[in-house]
Amino acid sequence: MARVKTGVVRRRRHKKVLKLARGFFSARRKHFRKAKEQVERSLVYSYRDRRNKKRDFRRLWIVRINAACRLNDISYSKFINALKKANIELDRKVLADLAMNDAAAFSAIVAQAKKVM
């Protein structure tokens, strides 16, 4: 069998890893072995945090809605329950945006929800 040399394959693989390691500090950017370890770890973090981001944003939206609800003399849980009873199908992302940027519209929604309570 003919001898197989890995020059081209290795160079491509190293370039791919070192390209992903751009922005890392010191040896984690320049040395292949350290860069490979750090890239593997960073890809795991990326995968995990893409899921955590959804949780974090939902939590942020709830905090914002709760703060705006308290200004309108209603608790968050009662407000969400009243929205469901009133068949107002706005998600938390939209409600949080209204609470932050359009207080009058949010107050109108709260008034509609209070009618059903």
Curated annotation (Swiss-Prot):
Gene Ontology BP, a term: ribosomal large subunit assembly
Coiled coil stretches, renumbered: none
Family matches, as Gene3D superfamilies: 6.10.160.10, Ribosomal protein L20
CDD domains associated with the record: Ribosomal_L20
GO cellular component assignments: ribonucleoprotein complex; ribosome
Keywords attached to this entry: Ribonucleoprotein, Ribosomal protein, RNA-binding, rRNA-binding
Function: Binds directly to 23S ribosomal RNA and is necessary for the in vitro assembly process of the 50S ribosomal subunit. It is not involved in the protein synthesizing functions of that subunit.
Family stated for the protein in its record: Belongs to the bacterial ribosomal protein bL20 family.
Protein name: Large ribosomal subunit protein bL20
Source organism per UniProt: Campylobacter hominis (strain ATCC BAA-381 / DSM 21671 / CCUG 45161 / LMG 19568 / NCTC 13146 / CH001A)
